[in-house]
């Protein structure tokens, strides 16, 4: 079995790392560079940098910030926020990213997934899917969760796989920032409906939640923010906890 990954996420706006609840009520979570340096030395498997206001404000991710972070970390770096063209993806890669995360733009223009994948490889394309439960259906939202779409989560996940995505970052908007655990129902449905890796996101509040995301949710990786940003747990602690319970991790 492949090692499961632990991935801290830097949600960035206004030049700072922030964290909210249900995509709202943002609070400051520190310096971008300080957090990036910390995770680089903390056994994180990868780092995700998401400019969470770029799509909402119809602007591009700040390349200067991406360059600074890429110069500080020596683990795979995924960058997302406002990436709406192959040219923009190229700029992000040129500034040190290993992968790009696309969301709003590819809901509007799904073929963008294929165009980026053809140029840079599927392994470099992460499609972020933000979902909210409504009447027992999990619906995809865009613009940092602000705009609902008619797309259902499993259907969209299968579509992005066919278009060339190499990975899916699945976030439960209902669980985001609540620390109540991942939504393992939709996580398992998506994970078992595709053959590309799925990253669990939204709701991690303790180490058992990470374990549940891997066992009940069938995830390939677990993304978390609050529990690591505010030093509730270290990534080393998380990995040791998982290893002790039979989950393969890199230590």
Curated annotation (Swiss-Prot):
SUPFAM superfamilies: Ribulose-phoshate binding barrel. GO terms for molecular function: imidazoleglycerol-phosphate synthase activity; lyase activity. Its main location: cytoplasm. GO terms for cellular component: cytoplasm. It is found in: Cytoplasm. Keywords: Amino-acid biosynthesis, Cytoplasm, Histidine biosynthesis, Lyase. InterPro entries: Aldolase_TIM (IPR013785), His_biosynth (IPR006062), HisF (IPR004651), IGPS_HisA/HisF (IPR050064), RibuloseP-bd_barrel (IPR011060). The active site is at residues 11, 130. Pfam families: His_biosynth. CDD domains: HisF. Gene3D superfamilies: Aldolase class I. Pathway: Amino-acid biosynthesis; L-histidine biosynthesis; L-histidine from 5-phospho-alpha-D-ribose 1-diphosphate: step 5/9. It catalyses: 5-[(5-phospho-1-deoxy-D-ribulos-1-ylimino)methylamino]-1-(5-phospho-beta-D-ribosyl)imidazole-4-carboxamide + L-glutamine = D-erythro-1-(imidazol-4-yl)glycerol 3-phosphate + 5-amino-1-(5-phospho-beta-D-ribosyl)imidazole-4-carboxamide + L-glutamate + H(+). It comes from the Bacteria. GO terms for biological process: L-histidine biosynthetic process. It is an enzyme of class 4 (lyase). The keyword Amino-acid biosynthesis applies. The keyword Cytoplasm applies. Its EC number is 4.3.2.10. IGPS catalyzes the conversion of PRFAR and glutamine to IGP, AICAR and glutamate. The HisF subunit catalyzes the cyclization activity that produces IGP and AICAR from PRFAR using the ammonia provided by the HisH subunit. Heterodimer of HisH and HisF. Belongs to the HisA/HisF family. This is Imidazole glycerol phosphate synthase subunit HisF. It comes from Chlorobium limicola (strain DSM 245 / NBRC 103803 / 6330).
